[in-house]
């Protein structure tokens, strides 16, 4: 398969400031990915605050509380805005790579008691079908060699390092925990090795508006 190519770019004003939206495409499959770039990232020797964010329609656009994705996306963009410089790669691998419809099927199995890993396996998929190597190629096309990577996922860090991207710091992104996703976060920590810091202490439960909602 041919490597991904940078094919388009334009300014994108957002509530977090003006980003340059950069489009990438595989020439053979036409599979698309996107990056949002803020500020001057041309100095390859200066680490760039970065986030690899896998597509999550339910969390990012529909404000689902079943995961922490939407909260992580908003927090990452806000932190880049505060820094004045950074890159967010929007990795278009919905549902950890199984696609939106299969993600809904997995949610149905979770409604019946399975955790997020068990549901994927029951549908015939691996726990995580994503390929993060393409993200390293996108960083290279942007001229980014060193990153401070906002993630709780050790696989993203290791994949970037193996691909030649120098991850000088892992920046934790523990946000958005609520009563609907605590089990999901716990599963990611215990079964996938994610660096999850739980917020489910008494003070959090008493002050978080999501945790005060009626349990469905």
Curated annotation (Swiss-Prot):
Gene Ontology biological-process annotations: riboflavin biosynthetic process
UniProt keyword GTP-binding, yes or no: yes
InterPro entries registered for this protein in UniProt: GTP_cyclohydro_II (IPR032677), RibA (IPR000926), RibA-like_sf (IPR036144)
Molecular function via GO: GTP binding; GTP cyclohydrolase II activity; zinc ion binding
Pathway info: Cofactor biosynthesis; riboflavin biosynthesis; 5-amino-6-(D-ribitylamino)uracil from GTP: step 1/4
Residues noted as binding Zn(2+) in the record, renumbered to the chain: 56, 67, 69
Family, as annotated: Belongs to the GTP cyclohydrolase II family.
The protein, known as: GTP cyclohydrolase-2
Known function: Catalyzes the conversion of GTP to 2,5-diamino-6-ribosylamino-4(3H)-pyrimidinone 5'-phosphate (DARP), formate and pyrophosphate.
EC class of the enzyme, as a word: hydrolase
Entry EC no(s): 3.5.4.25
PANTHER family hit by this protein: 3,4-DIHYDROXY-2-BUTANONE 4-PHOSPHATE SYNTHASE, GTP CYCLOHYDROLASE II-RELATED
Reactions catalysed according to its record: GTP + 4 H2O = 2,5-diamino-6-hydroxy-4-(5-phosphoribosylamino)-pyrimidine + formate + 2 phosphate + 3 H(+)
Any GO CC annotation of this UniProt entry: cytosol
Cofactor binding: number and manner: Binds 1 zinc ion per subunit.
Cofactors: Zn(2+)
Keywords carried by this UniProt record: GTP-binding, Hydrolase, Metal-binding, Nucleotide-binding, Riboflavin biosynthesis, Zinc
Record organism: Haemophilus influenzae (strain ATCC 51907 / DSM 11121 / KW20 / Rd)
Active site residues per record: 128 (proton acceptor), 130 (nucleophile)
Annotated residues for binding of GTP: 51-55, 72, 94-96, 116, 151, 156
């Amino acid at each position: 398969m041919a490597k991904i190519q940078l094919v388009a770019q334009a300014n994108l004003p957002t509530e977090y400031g003006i980003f340059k939206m950069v489009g990438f495409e595989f020439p053979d499959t036409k599979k698309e990915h996107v990056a949002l770039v803020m500020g001057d990232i041309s100095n390859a020797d200066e680490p760039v605050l970065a986030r690899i964010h896998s597509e999550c329609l339910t969390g990012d656009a529909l404000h689902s509380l079943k995961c922490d994705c939407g909260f992580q996306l908003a927090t990452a963009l806000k932190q880049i805005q505060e820094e004045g410089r950074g890159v967010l790669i929007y990795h278009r691998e919905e549902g950890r790579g199984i696609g939106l419809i299969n993600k809904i099927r997995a949610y149905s199995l979770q409604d019946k008691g399975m955790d997020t890993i068990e549901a994927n396996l029951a549908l015939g998929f691996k726990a995580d079908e994503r390929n993060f190597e393409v993200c390293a190629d996108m960083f290279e096309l942007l001229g980014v060699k060193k990153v401070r990577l906002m993630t709780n996922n050790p696989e993203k860090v290791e994949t970037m390092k193996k691909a030649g991207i120098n991850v000088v710091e892992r920046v934790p992104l523990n946000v958005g925990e609520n009563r609907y996703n605590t089990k999901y976060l716990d599963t990611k920590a215990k079964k996938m090795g994610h660096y999850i810091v739980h917020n489910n202490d008494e003070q959090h439960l008493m002050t978080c508006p999501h945790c005060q909602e009626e349990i469905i």
